[in-house]
């Protein structure tokens, strides 16, 4: 395990969320739900409350040299079974640089030290970059399922949709995408 002195994470606070407004934007219609669209103070406060007041959840910001470049979530924390659902969102300006993998290495080590035994996550089939990262970290694919596509309707005229057409299904004029559950056994595989 490498040490990354330029990368760190800590518990999220409201002041952190105001910096998310300065992040880049995903251009691909496949990833629009990852764009931080809240602009007003009221909307940002509501977003923070919505995320951090969920029971059995924890949120952390990702920092690179003190600049906030993303966040991590732990949801559905089960203290008895010592498992939780992992989420990660990066400022699009910091994607494809290996940062996601590096911060996840640090975060998974932290979770193991906290006594977590199993971490699971969900990834859309079309999010090949993320799936490759998770597999490199030792996550195993468990099963696939259909979910309502969160970013509008399928449009085969757009290259991102066309190149990933096997990831989508239209049912009763509604767009669904395939996603998968993946998990990592921290005791055995980390």
Could you tell me what each predicted segment is?
Residues 14, 37-95, 104, 175-189:
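Acetyl-CoA-dependent GNAT
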Residues 76-78, 145, 149:
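A short acidic/small-residue loop/turn micro-motif
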Residues 96-110, 132-136:
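Conserved acetyl-CoA-binding loop-helix of GNAT-fold acetyltransferases
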Residues 110, 121-131, 147-157:
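Conserved beta-strand-loop-alpha-helix junction that forms the acyl-donor binding cleft
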């Amino acid at each position: 395990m490498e040490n990354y002195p330029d990368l760190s994470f800590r518990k999220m606070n409201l002041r952190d969320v105001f910096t998310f407004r300065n992040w880049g934007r995903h251009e691909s219609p496949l990833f629009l739900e990852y764009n931080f669209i809240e602009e007003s103070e009221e909307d940002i406060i509501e977003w923070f409350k919505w995320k951090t007041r969920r029971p059995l959840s924890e949120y952390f910001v990702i920092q690179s040299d003190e600049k906030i470049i993303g966040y991590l979530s732990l949801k559905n924390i089960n203290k008895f079974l010592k498992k939780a659902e992992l989420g990660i969102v990066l400022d699009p300006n910091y994607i494809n640089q290996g940062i996601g993998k590096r911060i996840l290495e640090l975060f998974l080590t932290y979770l193991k030290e906290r006594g977590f035994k199993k971490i699971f996550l969900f990834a859309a089939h079309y999010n090949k970059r993320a799936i490759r990262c998770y597999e490199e970290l030792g996550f195993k694919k468990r099963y696939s399922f259909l979910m309502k596509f969160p970013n509008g309707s399928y449009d085969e005229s757009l290259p991102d949709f066309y190149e990933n057409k096997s990831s989508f299904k239209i049912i009763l004029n509604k767009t669904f995408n395939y996603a998968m559950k993946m998990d990592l056994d921290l005791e055995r595989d980390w």
